[in-house]
Amino acid sequence: MEFPIGSVGTTNFRRFTPESLAEIEKQIAAHGAAKKARAKHGERKGQDEKPRPQLDLKACNQLPRFYGELPAELVGEPLEDLDPFYSTHRTFMVLNKGRTISRFSATWALWLFSPFNLIRRTAIKVSVHAWFSIFITITILFNCVCMTQNDLPEKIEYAFTVIYTFEALIKILARGFCLNEFTYLRDPWNWLDFSVITLAYVGAAIDLRGISGLRTFRVLRALKTVSVIPGLKVIVGALIHSVRKLADVTILTVFCLSVFALVGLQLFKGNLKNKCIKRSTDPHNAYNFSSQMADNFYIKNGTTEPLLCGNGSDAGHCPSGYICLKTSDNPDFNYTSFDSFAWAFLSLFRLMTQDSWERLYQQTLRASGKMYMVFFVLVIFLGSFYLVNLILAVVTMAYEEQNQATIAEIEAKEKKFQEALEVLQKEQEVLAALGIDTTSLHSHNGSPLAPKNANERKHRIKSRVSEGSTDDNRSPQSDPYNQRRMSFLGLSSGRRRASHSSVFHFRAPSQDVSFPDGITDDGVFHGDHESHRSSLLLARGAGQAGPLPRSPLASSPNPGPGHREEGQLTAPTGELTTGAPEDLALEAAGQKKNFLSAEYLNEPFRAQRAMSVVSIMTSVIEELEESKLRCPPCLINLAQKYLIWECCPKWMKFKMVLFELVTDPFAELTITLCIVVNTIFMAMEHYPMTDAFDAMLQAGNIVFTVFFTMEMAFKIIAFDPYYYFQKKWNVFDCVIVTVSLLELSIAKKGSLSVLRTFRLLRVFKLAKSWPTLNTLIKIIGNSVGALGNLTFILAIIVFIFALVGKQLLGEDYGCRKDGTALWNEGQLRWHMCDFFHSFLVIFRILCGEWIENMWVCMQVSEKSICLILFLTVMVLGNLVVLNLFIALLLNSFSADNLTAPEDDGEVNNLQVALARTQAFGQRASQAISSYFSSHCRLRWPKVGSQLGVKPSLTSSKAEHHITADAVNTAVGTSAKPALSGPKEDPRDFITDANVWVSVPIAEGESDLDELEEDIEQNSQSSWREESPKGQQDQLWQIQRCEDHQVPNSPGSGMSSEDLASYLGERWKSEATPQVPAEGVDDTSSSEGSTVDCPDPEEILKKIPELADDLEEPDDCFTEGCTRHCPCCKVSTSKFPWTTGWQVRKTCYRIVEHSWFESFIIFMILLSSGALAFEDNYLEQKPRVKSMLEYTDRVFTFIFVFEMLLKWVAYGFKKYFTNAWCWLDFLIVNISLTSLIAKILDYSDVASLKALRTLRALRPLRALSRFEGMRVVVDALVGAIPSIMNVLLVCLIFWLIFSIMGVNLFAGKFSRCIDTSNNPFSVVNSTIVNNKSECRNQNHTGHFFWVNVKVNFDNVAMGYLALLQVATFKGWMDIMYAAVDSREINSQPQWEDNLYMYLYFVVFIIFGGFFTLNLFVGVIIDNFNQQKKKLGGQDIFMTEEQKKYYNAMKKLGSKKPQKPIPRPLNKYQGFVFDIVTRQAFDIIIMVLICLNMITMMVETDGQSEEKTKILGRINQFFVAVFTGECVMKMFALRQYYFTNGWNVFDFIVVILSIGSLVFSAILKSLESYFSPTLFRVIRLARIGRILRLIRAAKGIRTLLFALMMSLPALFNIGLLLFLVMFIYSIFGMASFANVVEEAGIDDMFNFQTFGNSMLCLFQITTSAGWDGLLSPILNTGPPYCDPNLSNNNTSKGNCGSPTVGIVFFTTYIIISFLIVVNMYIAVILENFNVATEESTEPLSEDDFDMFYETWEKFDPEATQFIAFSALSDFADTLSGPLRIPKPNQNILIQMDLPLVPGDKIHCLDILFAFTKNVLGESGELDSLKTNMEEKFMATNLSKASYEPIATTLRWKQEDISATVIQKAYRSYVLQRSLTLSNPLRVPRAEDDDAPLPGEGYVTFMANDSGRLPDKSETTSATSFPPSYDSVTRGLSDRVNISTSNSMHNEDEVTSKEGDSPGPQ
């Protein structure tokens, strides 16, 4: 950490002069020379040493305060760069008034202007000026507004071009053009500007029609707003980041869609051309004539489209008189087809995005057959749900990563800031110790740092500061100002909160004293988009070898001893410090920060230094304080003077009375009730209304408005306006009341009637007392805050695309002057003639509906442009940006928030009021009961004692009793109540001594379940308060009870036998607890009672294992029965009852037997299956009908028998306390009742018919019996509270829109229709203007005045309409009706009310988008909660441990395998060498791709020749792949089938050959076989493509996620199937006879079980449910006939609207919102897991690769390799485990154990290499031990070898031996030389003389290379724990120091020479 505090003062800012430039040149030269020198010596500069730019000095950031105040004369002037990084770059910086940093190149601009040229300096000054940016931004915005207009003069366009040209010229003059850094074109945003300007000039120069396309690029100017507003750049960064991340998903999506498209092409090509054509009466006339004539087509009822058909048995059939023939055109303007790969791909993309896919589904099934539903199920579930949600998962992840990075930056910066302040603080202490009075400097304005407005600040806080600093006796904490300052300086004891849940979350500055960003001049915080400073304050100077911080010393008149003239800093020792700033900082830190210390400074400088320090601190802290103030101090003083009303004492008294009144809890309760009643009043509005009802509602409105106005007035007087308006809720109230008063003064029918809708916002006041609503509003608020920038980006995207559409395609839509569009003689609603309509089209695409608009566009304009535009909007806008929205939403959402809202410490008055009311009610009821008991002398207790009943906790009224005193104390002392606080555990009151419970006298025994239920009831209704310590003893017996239950808690791991004995002991020892008598309240009749625990036997019966052993049924009746009716209590020891007891035991054994259960499951399945046959055609099949009636009776008897058996076996008590048994009981009763009714011939009664339909619930009984479904149901049940919460909140949100809809549209959706047309048409408003005219003109009987079926006539219908809008199904009709509406009973007119579109846009954003995505949030969160509850082991591991754990887990499951041995036969060997080469695999992959391409070329109706060629090519590929298969089998022999992929290839080859053979056979027998079979066989070819997956790693990860999801998805699928099954049975019973219209026709209907399932599968994704509901909403003419006779007894083809609405809305909520979202939750969860696996440092693949490489080095799979081969092995590995050569030293340092023969075990190597990748961690020794044990168990080879040494030991021994050898040789050599020297004089001491050969020895030792440092290897010695003994002694004896210096190696050598290691 560099502490740049040394750099305060104005001296930081020095003008950039030619000398500065010369200095930079010198630095660059020195830097280059140093670099060359390093290169010459072969040194590599470490990565850590690379200097990086300081984050806080980035261009566009604001300069932090610490650098001092910028003198006015230097604003906009070139300055020397403060960032040391740029000391070797030819740059300078410029600061504007707002201290924003701009960097410029110091080279010559355009080779003409030097940095000191006057023209260039002026351009620089202009370009950095704030007003310049503001002017350009305003110009851009104005230009955008102009572009939305249709007919703009060309001159305006030229004006804008001139302004942009001027801007570009200024920037180019200031920056230079493109060659150097920081020049104009080096900024990518300027590319955009430049291209826009260039294109403008090109367009002006060449005025041609084709060039108008160029003009479209003007639109890109809107993007310039992004470059001007800095916050947006970050979001764009996140978007680009997520788009990059989408690469893998995009590849997978394209691959999957291609495969599905190929399947579609093979199955359905040409089918959609089949249409029903009139049979020709002329036998000679060829059919091809009639097939082309549109007049001959059969038109589908209610539409203008020809009816499709197919020739298959289950395809759609033609009516009589028509024949099914293939025509030339496909449906939807010939765009919907599978005729070629491109169209099939488009259809599949449409299916994936689920845009009107139900239409494609119906067309395809009608043309091909119902069996192809399977194709759609696969595509929707695997393609659509999986792929689209993968995109969501990836975008969410990318966003999270971006978020984490930003948060990390903020935190690092805060830490540095904190450290810097600590340094400042220390420095201040030093100065104080030196006797400089820092306090006197507080008022000093002479400091160069003193801010301009320091005087104002000084006056404001002078008194506080001086008090705090001069009075030594006062503690600093006693003053809030000081306290804040202390905590700010990091001196307080409390820790700061670091809660960054999201970067984009708005956090009020008051929440924590941290500096997320630079603070500007005016004390405003800058948003999180600014980059975060790595070093806050480091200055720079010109040193010799690198940038040096310049100290204020440089400018001081008489510097201290640490100063040199040239601006270099010297340490006190006098040495010149040079080098990088990091080195300097370290060095300075090492010397106790001498360069910061004030100790060696002389007096004048100390004073200046002190002023700087104090000035920095005060300036920063005061600025923080100011930023917290909402308005300027002068306004605050004014407000305090005039807005706090304190007059005479009487007024004050009046105020106190009002204060008591408005703060009373009952006032809050009253207001809440009024809000609820007011809301109900508003919701009661409907059409048509009687005048009396209307008058009542009006009167109610006036009363409520007056009431709320009074409330506001009272509160303002009681609190004073000053305090009243500081609360947001009060401001909210005030606005609503004002609008309500305004609305009362306006006539009801006025244009401002929409003001009434503002009253609806009162509903939000409920949030004050409804925590869930409050939380949700907060979530949406947070998201909207967080989404500010993103919303802006989305708005820009919509704006740009809308303009592009208008410019490119507008003219093609046949636009007229009034902005409407004509096409094919009809008006278009969706066109791009004007900006508003263009915006609507783009918005509709963002809602996911793109295909229909695109068809129209392709009809009127160029197909390619339409395709590109629409798909770009769809992919960019919908899939990326909207998913980023959802990611943000999920990020700010958590079910914790919903289930446990944070307690803000305030007493909830509503709860207090409710508690008071409750207490009053309980006291009243108690008084009454005590009165009756004293008079009537009831004797229940006596009965209880006769029966031997033990007292216990049971549910009774008295249980909810709270002492009145307790309530009063709570309210009086404002104790914190926790009434029904969801975050408390229901059992808390047992363990919490502060909770007061009054316990009633027990009535009989209760089992554990009852006890828990009672506890839950108690917790929800009991009043909690802090009670005095004395009262705590009263709960000790309850706590003891809790102690009894502990062992029975789930997961306690106690065996049932232990439990039995434990409970028995406890029971005996604590049978009669004593109760302390003190503190018992008179008012309670029951507090002194004992509370016993249940009998242990009772508990034991609840334990399943023991229940089996006991095999004895429970008591038959409940305690209540036996108490009230003693005859029910029987003695089993007496005669008649003994037999009964034996019977019960027998029944119990039967019921508990597994066979019995299996039989019942079988019966349930059979009976459910039987229901499926009761369809609409049953009356025509008398045999089937009679058989079904018979089987129905049989099933009913069986189920009744089962129920009776269970009653006898379990007893009533156990049977009726089980929820699943209740379900069985109800379903059996339904069957029984309907059977009895049938026998008594009452079956035609309507109510009994409805009862019969309830038999559809029978399959529900299967739920409890299938484990998979039960798991899902349990998970769902767990999520129900949260789901209900969200549902309720959605309803509240929607209520507002629904009431608004009723206000706007009630009665306005009616219209006059002409039924003579098909489909019915709306009569033009010029012919019929209103209802009466429609009735008068109905001469033909064809005119009907009808209402749109889904409308806003009342709030309930409004809800239905909103559900259709939110699911985007049927919303068009509702919108059209709204937009065309005029007045009540007036005929609608085309787009008369155009801007009503905006009502729907707003609802879709808030009501649809937010609320429906909250479902995803809730469910995902609940899954995660439950996962944590179930598998908590992960939570207690650190991230690092998890990495290790996962890596070890993976490598533990692997072991070396023998490679496939090379065959001995030379031919086989040759082939083996070919097929095992990588090149062979690559060739095969290329061939597969080519095969795929040839399959894509196929089209419908291709020529014979093309068919032949493609057939031959196919045969060639089959031959190639067969050849590959044969070669591999020949070479690999039996080993071929050991690989899964080989087996897959083999199957594909067999199928391919089979399909060729079958094709040949079928060709000759074409007339006998259906072509479908032929097509399905050809699909085998597609299997080959799937082999590509083998090669793509990214795709494998994503598919791995899918594979992991499959089990869970299967369970969810089962549940979904069950729901569909039940609903289809209901549908058959209720809607079989509705008229065929809209979505219901002869194929998609509820007449048979199969057809019902087709319909329900379609609406599982909510697709087309409006079409299915539409006919069911018909109640009479002209739509249906209620008197029509049908097949069966029921009459008419009208529907039942109520049943239909309930049926469809419940199904949509269950399937589309809940079950499908569970599916999504599972996918997201598993995707995260899979991605974690793939992003971990070591993946499964790395370990596989390790073992694959191992096989080459250890062909015999001995699991050992020679130490000599280790270096090659390490180098051969790939990926993170590889250790490239030269690696000898690293390997030796790993200290690997050696076994005899110098071999190393694979596990040791893998452990060491893994550690090399993951780094040190001391926590995992035990894990390694476990791993090794596991490995030993599976691979016994290792256990037989005990290590004898390690690689390090071996090296040391080797070196020691070498050293001794060399020394000895040297000695021998010298000796022989000496002895042979004839001049030598022999001496007696020769033998003991020291050897003179030390230099030689050292040289030899150095030769053997660098030795490892023992400190690097000590932790490795424990690596394989079993070898500790080998290495421990070694580490004790040997001490090796690592260094490249000879000096160190000398030491080692001498040591080794002295103590040789054991050999």
Curated annotation (Swiss-Prot):
III repeats lie at residues 1142-1451. The gene is Scn10a. Residues 1853-1882 form the IQ domain. Ubiquitinated by NEDD4L; which promotes its endocytosis. Phosphorylation at Ser-1453 by PKC in a highly conserved cytoplasmic loop slows inactivation of the sodium channel and reduces peak sodium currents. Residues 44-53, 523-533, 1943-1959 have a biased composition (Basic and acidic residues). Glycans are attached at residues 288, 311, 334. The lineage of its organism: Eukaryota, Metazoa, Chordata, Craniata, Vertebrata. Residues 1-125, 175-187, 233-248, 399-659, 720-727, 774-789, 891-1149, 1213-1218, 1267-1285, 1421-1473, 1533-1538, 1597-1611, 1725-1959 are cytoplasmic. O.torridus is resistant to the pain-inducing components of the venom of its prey, the bark scorpion (Centruroides sculpturatus). It is most probably due to the unique inhibition by some venom components of the Scn10a sodium-channel in those rodents. Inhibition of Snc10a would, in turn, inhibit sodium currents, block action potential propagation and induce analgesia. Glu-862 plays a central role in that inhibition and its replacement by a Gln, the corresponding amino acid found in the M.musculus ortholog, prevents the inhibition of Snc10a. GO terms for biological process: membrane depolarization during action potential; neuronal action potential; regulation of atrial cardiac muscle cell membrane depolarization; regulation of heart rate. Residues 475-484 have a biased composition (Polar residues). Keywords: Cell membrane, Disulfide bond, Glycoprotein, Ion channel, Ion transport, Membrane, Phosphoprotein, Repeat, Sodium, Sodium channel, Sodium transport, Transmembrane, Transmembrane helix, Transport, Ubl conjugation, Voltage-gated channel. Changing residue 215 to G: Complete loss of inhibition by the venom of Centruroides sculpturatus. Decrease in inhibition by the venom of Centruroides sculpturatus. Residues 341-365, 835-855, 1356-1377, 1649-1671 dip into the membrane without crossing it. Its main location: membrane. The sequence contains 4 internal repeats, each with 5 hydrophobic segments (S1, S2, S3, S5, S6) and one positively charged segment (S4). Segments S4 are probably the voltage-sensors and are characterized by a series of positively charged amino acids at every third position. It catalyses: Na(+)(in) = Na(+)(out). This is Sodium channel protein type 10 subunit alpha. Residues 150-154, 207-212, 273-340, 366-372, 685-695, 748-753, 811-834, 856-864, 1174-1186, 1241-1244, 1314-1355, 1378-1393, 1498-1508, 1563-1574, 1635-1648, 1672-1699 are extracellular. It comes from Onychomys torridus. It is a multi-pass membrane protein. I repeats lie at residues 116-404. InterPro entries: Ion_trans_dom, Na_channel_asu, Na_chnl_inactivation_gate, Na_trans_assoc_dom, VGCC_Ca_Na, Volt_channel_dom_sf. Residues 33-43 have a biased composition (Basic residues).
